[in-house]
């Protein structure tokens, strides 16, 4: 959520910044919310004047009674003032609802470093690590490797649940679990994160706090009989752990790493991404979430990207980093980087992590603040999160990049102690 004061004082600047944002968003609603806010503020001024008048009249009543005067008219005036205040309070409540409705649907303001552009083709590559894997044979896609090696069962996943659900079997299940443990160990032992194992279901306030609601409700899995939502990412429960709290400034930054299953109703509809593990309704991920002071947040974003990189480097998987343009930025981020792993079957890089700085956008929605001393006025924290990284896509990348001509797959060195083997065959 944006700062309403900033909308009032920098209206045209904000409208310009939000143009070409890539969201289905009409910047003219900013004028609407400012008009509603002006109406609300005028009524609040009237209410204060009425309350002052009521206090003055109220003070007259005991004086008149003491003097033996009739207070009938004064009491009637008191009731009339009270009715006006009650009516104005109702108008303010109605305006608050209208303002909040709009404010929850206004996307974040892009950082000036965000490139101009409309689609992912306009994202700017800023780094590559490793070289795309070359083969002296025709490589297989991960879905064929997973089936041939009896690691993945797409047919039974479909039978049990439906399309885009997968059963991991035998060494495939062990590979998934080994990657999870490797990522968590890397982030907690080496990168300084505190591990969290969060709930996989959250309430509406939590989904609103991180920005999934109200805009993306149709993309979420909702438990109809009680109003819970299955989490699309551990970002939601971990960020909302601190909702409506004021944190101690000297404890910042707070850094959490969380493994969870993730659930996405909208999983894509066309192209090769619909095959295999790339777009699933249920998948596993290790998420990195940070809470920090505003002056720390962009340095912490750089570190967050490096932490996500570290697990891919540890696995020897080639990747690149792109800075996301305005039109591809999404609803909540002020600045975002995608890390894309090389996928031979696609002959291109495929997103495996997104690392974002939300500045105070989520903190305002979730009311997460900090202060440096007990007497200091609380300020909103900045929140950041990044995939550290997606597990299923890592499985796919390992199968494709480490495959051998005979159809076997070499286990990356970093996973051998977890897998207790050197080769999948």
Swiss-Prot record:
Q: Where does ATP bind?
A: 264-266, 351-354
Q: Which GO terms describe its cellular component?
A: cytoplasm
* Record's subcellular location: Cytoplasm
- EC assignment: 6.1.1.11
Q: Which UniProt keywords apply?
A: Aminoacyl-tRNA synthetase, ATP-binding, Cytoplasm, Ligase, Nucleotide-binding, Protein biosynthesis
Q: In which pathway does it act?
A: Aminoacyl-tRNA biosynthesis; selenocysteinyl-tRNA(Sec) biosynthesis; L-seryl-tRNA(Sec) from L-serine and tRNA(Sec): step 1/1
User: Catalytic activity, per the record?
Assistant: tRNA(Ser) + L-serine + ATP = L-seryl-tRNA(Ser) + AMP + diphosphate + H(+); tRNA(Sec) + L-serine + ATP = L-seryl-tRNA(Sec) + AMP + diphosphate + H(+)
Listed under GO biological process in this entry are: selenocysteine biosynthetic process; seryl-tRNA aminoacylation
**Top-level EC class:** ligase
- Where is L-serine annotated to bind? 233-235, 287, 387
Q: Which GO molecular function terms does the record list? A: ATP binding; catalytic activity, acting on a protein; serine-tRNA ligase activity; transferase activity
On assembly, the entry states: Homodimer. The tRNA molecule binds across the dimer.
What family does this belong to?
Answer: Belongs to the class-II aminoacyl-tRNA synthetase family. Type-1 seryl-tRNA synthetase subfamily.
As for what it does, the entry says: Catalyzes the attachment of serine to tRNA(Ser). Is also able to aminoacylate tRNA(Sec) with serine, to form the misacylated tRNA L-seryl-tRNA(Sec), which will be further converted into selenocysteinyl-tRNA(Sec).
Q: What is known of its domains?
A: Consists of two distinct domains, a catalytic core and a N-terminal extension that is involved in tRNA binding.
Q: What protein does this entry describe?
A: Serine--tRNA ligase
What species does this protein belong to? Clostridium perfringens (strain 13 / Type A)
